[in-house]
Amino acid sequence: MLNFDKESILEYSKVGCSGVLALASNYLASIDDKYTVIVSDILHHSGLVNIDEKYKDRVINVGIAEQNEIGVATGLVNQGFEVYASVYTGFAVARALDQIKVSMGYMQMPIKIIAFDSGFNDSSLGLVYNLKE
């Protein structure tokens, strides 16, 4: 079980977003057989490379395909899965926005988006990772 007392929160802050996502994913996968995470080629950056071996089949890497990530998530939600989509913030806003509007807005699919690194956090990766919108 994940705790949210002062000591636990201090420990979570030491491992960062990706470490907490791995901890949360292990916990959620242990209590929910339908828990699934979809990533768009950010398995290492999201920390999901550290998910327990017994839950590896719950992580789907669609490659550099943020638009398709939302489409795959929609299909899985439609089949009863609890889906979280992990994506760079800039790519969720710019590349997958149409799919987000249709799938989550119009179709009301309860996909949870976990967005990483907004702003200039990943400038070393190139200009496309800088979120200026």
Indicate residue ranges for each PLM-predicted region.
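Thiamine diphosphate
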Residues: M1-E133
